């Protein structure tokens, strides 16, 4: 039987919904990703973030390789029912594959003519130490 709460989500033509991940406590926006029905269902079951990887075409349990899982405290649906917000605790404080706290580590500084994107968050851990080849 279809779950009513999953049917309420307005999925796009590819069966996906955009997801914003926000840290509990700081309210920092950590990342943006997509979920399909299975990913949202798994997230609710596990209490940890599971996304749909568009490049790998498979479910992606956040932290499955790095250990940097996201413990979900709350799931919210926006007013148009087409965007999900996850409020999470980020394990080891690293959400980004670059080894940073947030994927939003570049800030626009300057004006429209001469401005540029500046890196404003440090690398907390070298990605080569996070993602190692599996035997």
UniProtKB/Swiss-Prot annotation:
Superkingdom of origin: Bacteria
A Gene Ontology term for the protein's cellular component: cytoplasm
One Pfam family in the UniProt entry: PRA-CH
Cofactor remark from the record: Binds 1 Mg(2+) ion per subunit. Binds 1 zinc ion per subunit.
GO molecular function terms noted in the UniProt entry: magnesium ion binding; phosphoribosyl-AMP cyclohydrolase activity; zinc ion binding
EC number: 3.5.4.19
UniProt-annotated binding residues for Mg(2+): 78, 80, 82
Compartment(s): Cytoplasm
Membrane-crossing residue ranges in chain numbering: none
Catalytic activity annotation: 1-(5-phospho-beta-D-ribosyl)-5'-AMP + H2O = 1-(5-phospho-beta-D-ribosyl)-5-[(5-phospho-beta-D-ribosylamino)methylideneamino]imidazole-4-carboxamide
InterPro entries: PRA-CH, PRib_AMP_CycHydrolase_dom, PRib_AMP_CycHydrolase_sf
Pathway as given in its UniProt record: Amino-acid biosynthesis; L-histidine biosynthesis; L-histidine from 5-phospho-alpha-D-ribose 1-diphosphate: step 3/9
Assembly information from the UniProt record: Homodimer.
HAMAP family according to UniProt: HisI (MF_01021)
Family: Belongs to the PRA-CH family.
Protein name in the entry: Phosphoribosyl-AMP cyclohydrolase
Organism lineage: Bacteria, Pseudomonadati, Pseudomonadota, Betaproteobacteria, Burkholderiales
The encoding gene: hisI
């Amino acid at each position: 039987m279809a779950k009513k709460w999953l049917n309420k989500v307005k999925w796009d033509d590819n069966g996906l919904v955009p997801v914003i991940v926000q840290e509990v406590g700081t309210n920092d926006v950590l990342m943006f990703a997509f979920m399909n029905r299975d990913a949202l269902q798994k997230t609710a079951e596990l209490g940890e973030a599971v996304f749909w990887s568009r490049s790998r075409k498979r479910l992606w349990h956040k932290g499955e390789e790095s250990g940097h899982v996201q413990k979900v405290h709350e799931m919210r649906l926006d007013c148009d029912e087409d965007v999900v917000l996850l409020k999470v605790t980020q394990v080891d404080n690293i959400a980004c594959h670059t080894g940073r706290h947030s994927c939003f580590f570049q800030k626009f500084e300057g004006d429209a003519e001469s401005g540029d994107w500046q890196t404003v968050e440090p690398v907390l851990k070298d990605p080569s130490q996070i993602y190692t080849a599996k035997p």
